[in-house]
């Protein structure tokens, strides 16, 4: 989740300060199926795993078999020569170990002066890469020679690990002076130019504050879920359970990062209210009391339906607690950008801040 905060603040800083920089959003082609077993073993040994542990992992990875199912007919089992089995609880951990080698290669190149990251005034030595599983974002200073070095690093990593980068599905975003050479960068990497907002870990990223239209994905999820319940004659108690356990949880991830616009909040409450009073949300039905009363706790006469506005503020306040009690990359970025060595009590809200 911290990666979303870093991504949002970086994009906002590059755009508002008109700084030069490049963001490269990488797409791996069938990531889990391409991992080379030999590279995995070398990575485990490099990270200090014992030989016994490496042998266990080798037996687990190479000991599996697969079969092909065509028209309900399952073929004979056979062994594969590379890749990690999807659905296995160990596979994500091993994939992260392999993918982390890309970050190591980039950090070594940065230490040698071959590449430089963005926003060095907020992040020590500049921000160069963000990784979460197979979601990888690369940040690069506006310099064509550095871009060539980065392309070479990606090709080397692809050859060593087996993780093939799908450049045709990858996207590049240019800021400041880099926009004038966007075509050259695009041709170098063989990718497309990205547009805002784009999604990172399921969250829309934009250089401005999100508008009502950017929340349409949440409203669409509400409507799709409600359409599956349409026509089912459930009781008030049944609909109350569905409200609290399913419908109210749909926007939680977005509410953890952004303040919900008032118009979006009203529409989501309208969908929930319509479903509660009538199983068909498209049909109007007389409401016996205000929705605010329904959202009150049971000991105050309500039904305990989740108040999205209050929940939104609670989720956002968790970031404040983490900011004051942590020392990670995103905490240092926010402190350097907003606090600048001052205590939090001296911070003032400025219009237009992210």
Show the residue positions of the predicted features.
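A helix-boundary/hinge signal
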Residues: 1-354
């Amino acid at each position: 989740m911290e990666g979303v905060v870093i991504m949002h603040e970086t994009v906002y800083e590059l755009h508002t300060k008109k700084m030069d920089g490049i963001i490269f959003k990488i797409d791996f082609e069938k990531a889990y199926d391409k991992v080379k077993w030999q590279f995995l073993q070398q990575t485990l040994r490099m990270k200090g795993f014992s030989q016994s542990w490496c042998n266990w992992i080798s037996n687990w990875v190479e000991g599996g078999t697969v079969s092909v199912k065509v028209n309900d007919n399952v073929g004979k089992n056979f062994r594969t020569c590379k890749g990690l089995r999807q659905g296995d609880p160990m596979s994500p951990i091993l994939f992260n170990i392999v993918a982390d080698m890309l970050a190591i290669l980039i950090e070594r190149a940065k230490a040698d002066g071959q590449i430089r990251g963005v926003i060095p005034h907020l992040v020590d030595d500049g921000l160069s890469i963000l990784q979460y599983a197979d979601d990888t974002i690369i940040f690069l200073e506006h310099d064509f020679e550095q871009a060539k070095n980065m392309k070479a690093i990606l090709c080397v990593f692809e050859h060593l690990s087996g993780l093939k980068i799908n450049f045709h599905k990858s996207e590049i975003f240019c800021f400041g002076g880099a926009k004038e050479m966007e075509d050259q960068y695009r041709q170098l990497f063989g990718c497309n130019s990205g547009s805002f907002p784009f999604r990172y870990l399921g969250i829309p990223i934009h250089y401005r504050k999100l508008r009502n239209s950017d929340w349409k994905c949440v409203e669409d999820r509400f409507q799709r879920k409600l359409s599956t319940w349409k026509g089912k004659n459930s009781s008030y108690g049944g609909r109350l359970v569905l409200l609290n356990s399913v419908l109210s949880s749909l926007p939680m991830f977005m509410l953890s990062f952004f303040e919900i616009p008032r118009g979006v909040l009203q529409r989501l409450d309208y969908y929930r209210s319509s479903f509660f009073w009538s199983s068909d949300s498209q049909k109007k039905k007389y409401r016996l009391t205000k929705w605010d009363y329904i959202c009150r706790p049971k000991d105050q006469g309500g039904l305990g339906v989740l108040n999205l506005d209050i929940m939104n503020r609670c989720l956002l306040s968790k970031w404040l607690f983490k900011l004051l009690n942590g020392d990670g990359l995103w905490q240092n970025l926010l402190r350097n950008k907003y606090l600048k060595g001052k205590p939090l009590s001296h911070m003032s809200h400025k219009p237009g801040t992210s």
